[in-house]
Amino acid sequence: MASPQVIVLGSGNVASHLLEAFVAAQVSCGLWSRNCGHARALAARVGDDKVEVFDCLADVPRDSFFYVIAVSDNAVAALIEELGPVEGVVAHTSGSVPLQEPFADGRYGVFYPLQTFSSDVSVDMSKVPFFVEGNNPAVTELLKELAALFGANAYEADSLHRAQLHLAAVFASNFANSLWVVAEGILKDAGYPLDVLEPLLKETLRKAMAYGPRQAQTGPAARNDTKVLSRQMEELEGIPLEIYRLITELIRSQQMPPDETENKEIQ
């Protein structure tokens, strides 16, 4: 029996979405996870007849084309070492873990999808940008071909640039979502649901992508409406108040020409 073309190692959110994308693209897949129950449940979801599950890492074939390691950042290096030398390309999916090369003669790389994943939310993987790095140019090209199997675009990014991409994503996604939590609390206190903000959020994103976020910035800080700023700060306390002050300072600085930018603290 021929070995699967792609072995996915892991059964979390990233592993799940990648496996589904490969299976949908008619790629023969194998799956391994330290949690055998999770692996079998994932295989059942995408189709038991389409995925070969390996209960033991030692049973994973060594002659597959790709080994995609989709585990937590702090588990990547240990799993690569535990897997040992294989014939195919070994690539992890982390944006913040550098390229791993534990074996002198192997082919290693990074296959980083710039997207947030949840177990219960479907993602069109063909629209997710992948950032790839190989330990040689041939491996980099192979990783681009791997993304192309399900129609995704792949861009080259070394460890430094990948870390910058990850940092940008933290600001754009994680921090923004945290602010939505604050907004949700304010709305709840006023008796309104979060979905009243949905049209605003969609239009904010549309304008940011169409015109650039600096040009699309609106609100009391952008127009330096000190009366509104003061009134709103009176309604806040603790960390939300400090965040309001800091972000207002940031917005003000972003609206100034570079030679006029100065650090003005809000009172």
Language model features: what each stretch is:
Residues 1-58:
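NAD(P)+-binding Rossmann beta1-loop-alpha1 motif at the extreme N-terminus of oxidoreductases
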Residues 3, 87, 127:
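Phosphate-coordination loops involved in phosphoryl transfer and adenosine-cofactor binding
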Residues 18, 25, 37-45, 105-107, ...:
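Internal alpha-helical scaffold of NAD(P)-dependent oxidoreductase catalytic cores
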Residues 7, 31, 68-69, 132:
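Conserved SAM-binding loop
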Residues 68, 169-172, 176, 237, ...:
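Amphipathic, non-transmembrane alpha-helical scaffold segments
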Residues 195-267:
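NAD(P)-dependent Rossmann-like dehydrogenase/reductase catalytic/cofactor-binding core
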Residues 36-122:
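Rossmann-like NAD(P)(H) cofactor-binding subdomain of soluble oxidoreductases
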